[in-house]
A protein has these predicted regions:
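Structural detector of well-ordered beta-strand residues that form the stable sheet scaffold
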Residues: 53, 78, 99, 159-160, ...
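Active-site phosphate-binding strand-loop segment of PLP-dependent enzymes
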Residues: 106-220, 227-228
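Short beta-strand->loop structural element characteristic of the AMP-binding/adenylate-forming
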Residues: 81, 97-107, 341
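Conserved coil-to-alpha-helix start sites within the AMP-binding
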Residues: 83-88
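Hydrophobic "anchor" residues on beta-strands that sit immediately upstream
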Residues: 1, 76, 157-158
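PLP-dependent aminotransferase class I/II
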Residues: 36-42, 49-50, 113, 132-136, ...
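Phosphate-binding glycine-rich loop
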Residues: 28-76, 90-94, 100-102
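N-terminal "arm"/small-domain region of PLP-dependent enzymes with the aminotransferase-like
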Residues: 1-29, 34, 419
């Protein structure tokens, strides 16, 4: 059994994919060929934004967004603590400081209440300028953008949507009444089965990004990424930054940029895959996820999809009682030939790369300088079992913020992702669920 069966997908799409790749190879236009621009137009139309600019990978996409906004030293960028490393990695690369924010237990996405607390702490400290919030559409589910946007607007923050895992997800948007009394539609798409317009992932941020890493909801056969925005000025800057800071032509370099282009072969592959994704893959993976939930909801904490939200299911992630139960289940699944993954085993605020107080945040310490969160003999992160830790440590002079992010820390010890993809069979789902029941019954 495959965790994400890319080989099966290729078998289904082989004829179209081979034809597209051979066409790109025969064209001789391997960099920024016509398929790249065609794909950008198709992606922009699918998402419902004015501009889509492809690039080399999802990490570069985030970097390009920060560059377009001029983010740098002295700026605070708020990032969920429970996510892939690159969501925060790009911040210190631009000289700015990541400030980690806790997430919701139910959805795994950024907690807007904790975001506001973190912004207030940064403002009270007075050393950093709050500039950006990175909202991650984790595991395919869009973040709560209504709540995130409310905080962002109150404090003048830009919203960067990290849709690396979220492409294809959506939220039904309530209609709003304008000053003239007329109804303003919440979005440009009406999805099947919805009685209200739905806004798609990668259209919620002031700038949004995605990744085309092969295992993503929409993936190529290498690396790739894209940036989405409705802002003409930012789009022009990103277009410049992605090709060495070019001006009117590629040898007119007006700023320091990157070499970050999606090649023509990958664009041709993505054109084929986007068609399949929109026509049936997104529906099929949602149907498969529903089968998992129906079979498992009485024995384990299954993913929560809020009313009006739709996930693209980059992962199907269950929650166990504790690390011991999670590890035992993973071992039992492995013994039966069933793959599973832990996304993610360590919260960002405990990553070694962010231990330098001039880079990120450090975990809370007691009066002797001892880190209050420690690892057990198996390398798992454990909270102290006493009442001396309030989960909101007092600020230390050398740190930007000492939010422990207890929910994120706990999730890292309890989450387990199961095999899921658009081509998984009901028999395979039953095999996984029966194996889980053997352990948890």
């Amino acid at each position: 059994m495959e965790f994400r069966d890319l080989k099966k997908q290729y078998q289904v799409l082989r004829e179209e994919l081979d034809r597209a790749v051979l066409g790109a190879m025969a064209s001789g236009a391997y960099i920024m060929g016509p398929q790249v621009r065609e794909l950008e137009q198709q992606l922009a139309e699918y998402v419902g934004v004015k501009h889509c600019l492809t690039c080399a990978n999802g990490t570069d996409a985030l970097t390009l967004a920060l560059k377009a906004w001029g983010i740098g030293p002295g700026d605070a960028v708020f990032v969920p603590d429970f996510t892939f490393f690159s969501s925060a990695e790009v911040v210190p690369l631009e000289g700015a400081t990541p400030v980690f924010v806790d997430v919701f237990e139910e959805t795994f996405n950024i907690d807007a209440v904790d975001l506001e607390r973190a912004v207030k702490e940064v403002l009270a400290e007075g050393r950093l300028r709050p500039r950006v919030v990175v909202a991650v559409d984790l595991f395919g589910l869009p973040a709560d953008y209504q709540a995130v946007r409310a905080v962002a607007d109150r404090y003048g923050l830009l919203v960067l949507e990290d849709g690396a895992q979220g492409f294809g997800g959506s939220i039904q948007m309530a209609d709003q009444v304008g000053h003239d009394g007329n109804v303003i539609p919440g979005a440009s798409h009406v999805l099947a089965g919805c009685d209200r317009p739905s806004k798609r992932a990668c259209s919620f941020g002031d700038i949004a990004t995605t990744s085309f890493f092969p295992a993503k909801p929409l993936g190529c056969y290498g690396d790739g990424g894209a940036v989405f925005t409705d802002n003409d000025e930012w789009a022009a800057l990103i277009n410049s930054y992605r090709v060495h800071g070019k001006g009117t032509f590629k040898y007119d370099n007006v700023r320091i940029g990157l070499n970050s282009r999606l090649d023509t072969v990958q664009a041709a592959i993505l054109q084929v895959k986007l068609k399949a994704f929109a026509e049936y893959e997104l529906d099929d993976i949602n149907a498969a996820a529903e089968k998992y939930t129906e079979r498992l909801k009485d024995i384990v904490a299954t993913p929560v999809i809020p009313t009006g939200f739709r996930s693209s299911w980059a992962q199907y992630t269950i929650k166990l009682k504790d690390a011991a139960q999670r590890d035992a289940l993973q071992a039992a699944l492995k013994a039966e030939g069933i793959p599973s993954m832990v996304y993610y085993p360590k919260p960002l605020h405990l990553q070694t790369a962010f231990a330098d107080p001039h880079v990120g945040l450090r975990p809370p310490q007691d009066d002797k300088g001892t880190v209050r969160v420690h690892q057990d003999d198996k390398g798992r992160f454990v909270l102290p079992q006493d009442d001396s830790l309030s989960f909101r440590a007092e600020p230390q002079a050398e740190s930007r913020n000492l939010n422990l992010c207890p929910v994120a820390t706990s999730l890292c010890s309890r989450v387990l992702s199961l095999p899921l993809h658009p081509y998984i069979t009901e028999e395979q789902i039953d095999t996984v669920c029966n194996a889980i029941r053997k352990v948890l019954r």
